């Protein structure tokens, strides 16, 4: 596991963009070094190239990036295990409002309803029915 600098914010998209480069470096390193040596190199890279180091470590550990857990050290020296922001967002408990999925579902339903009953046609139909009832009441049809 890695100890990333406290000042660095880990963004999954940035790390994913570096995976091809990390894979190339890993292929070169794995031909000459074992897993522990590669971990040592990754730890030394953390200060300069944090995102690349995380990508390389996830490849070395054979884990998907979004599951790769990172230890975070606070200024007081407390070590906590945190996942990247996207994973935390996905796993977070919904406290208020509607979930994104529910919002999307409602939007899809609204779109279907709009297509099925366009406002102009619905209004015209109401007026037509009202006129027919009025004509019937007056005995014209």
UniProtKB/Swiss-Prot annotation:
Compositionally biased tracts (Basic residues): 100-112, 124-141
Gene Ontology cellular component terms for the protein in this record: virion component
Presence of keyword Iron: no
Residue ranges, compositional bias (Basic and acidic residues): 80-91
InterPro entries: Phage_T4_Gp68 (IPR016415)
Record keyword DNA repair present: no
Keywords per UniProt: Virion
Swiss-Prot/TrEMBL site (Cleavage) positions: 16-17
Location of region: Disordered: 80-141
Known function: Plays a role in the phage head size determination. About ten copies of gp68* are found in the mature phage head.
UniProt protein name: Prohead assembly protein gp68
Gene: gp68
């Amino acid at each position: 596991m890695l100890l990333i600098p406290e000042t660095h914010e880990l963004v999954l998209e940035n790390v994913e963009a570096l995976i091809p480069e990390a894979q190339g470096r890993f292929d070169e390193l794995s031909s000459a070094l074992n897993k522990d040596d590669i971990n040592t190199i990754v730890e030394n890279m953390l200060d300069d190239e944090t995102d690349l180091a995380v990508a390389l470590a996830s490849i070395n550990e054979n884990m998907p990036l979004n599951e790769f857990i990172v230890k975070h050290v606070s200024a007081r020296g407390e070590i906590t295990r945190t996942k990247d922001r996207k994973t935390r967002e996905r796993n977070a408990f919904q406290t208020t409002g509607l979930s994104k999925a529910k919002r999307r579902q409602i939007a899809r339903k609204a779109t279907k309803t709009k297509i099925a009953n366009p406002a102009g046609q619905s209004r015209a139909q109401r007026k037509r029915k009202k006129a027919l009832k009025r004509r019937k009441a007056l005995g014209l049809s």
